[in-house]
């Protein structure tokens, strides 16, 4: 296991990588990997914003690499079967879909700033994001709720529901 992904990208024995980092790293990590000759799969969301998404497309073309982004529900046999039933007309002509999330999330509170814990390379973790004083509010799962690192629940959970709706309607 490597703490610095660039060491993995430099390894000529590796053909492809899967990127499952906080969202703010997705684009730069994928571009570095493609520049190093790797094909790339990135977990949702593919990028932190639209501009970065366009950069990923350009990089895949420039380096002639395969780039894929996805959500795990696409791999569910039950969901695949449900989508097939929709497309076969089991419930009629589907013209609209709504994705809903009913998931209570506890308040993460304000943990304030503190010294960086031993073993965490905070400069590397922060990467392309704006450097801020370390707070436990920014790491582990909590990074989702800060724009510097995540996309809130839209980029965390909403993307699953949106993808299901688009897939079911055969528009994405």
Language model segments and positions:
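Alpha-helix C-terminal capping/helix-to-coil transition sites in glycosyltransferase folds
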Residues: 11-13
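Conserved SAM-binding strand-loop segment of SAM-dependent methyltransferases
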Residues: 1-4
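Beta-strand-loop-alpha-helix segment that lines the small-molecule cofactor/substrate pocket
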Residues: 22, 27-75, 89
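Predominantly a Rossmann-like dinucleotide-binding segment in NAD(P)-dependent oxidoreductases
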Residues: 63-69, 73-172
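Short loop/turn elements that flank and shape the SAM/SAH-binding pocket of Class I
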Residues: 6-9
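N-terminal Rossmann-like NAD(P) cofactor-binding module of classical short-chain dehydrogenase/reductase
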Residues: 16-18
């Amino acid at each position: 296991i490597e703490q610095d992904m660039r060491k993995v990208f430099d390894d000529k024995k590796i053909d492809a990588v899967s990127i499952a980092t906080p969202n703010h790293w997705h684009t730069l990590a994928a571009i570095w990997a493609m520049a190093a000759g790797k094909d790339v799969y990135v977990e949702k969301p593919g990028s932190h914003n639209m501009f970065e998404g366009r950069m990923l497309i350009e990089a895949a073309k420039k380096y002639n690499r395969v780039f894929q982004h996805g959500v795990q529900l696409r791999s569910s046999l039950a969901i695949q079967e449900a989508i097939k039933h929709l497309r076969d007309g089991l419930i009629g002509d589907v013209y609209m879909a709504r994705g809903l999330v009913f998931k209570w999330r506890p308040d993460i509170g304000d943990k304030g700033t503190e010294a960086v814990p031993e073993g965490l390379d905070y400069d590397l973790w922060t990467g392309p994001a704006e450097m801020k004083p370390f707070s436990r509010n920014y790491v582990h799962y909590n990074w989702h709720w800060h724009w510097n690192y995540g996309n809130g629940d839209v980029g965390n959970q909403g993307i699953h529901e949106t993808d299901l709706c688009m897939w079911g309607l055969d528009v994405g």
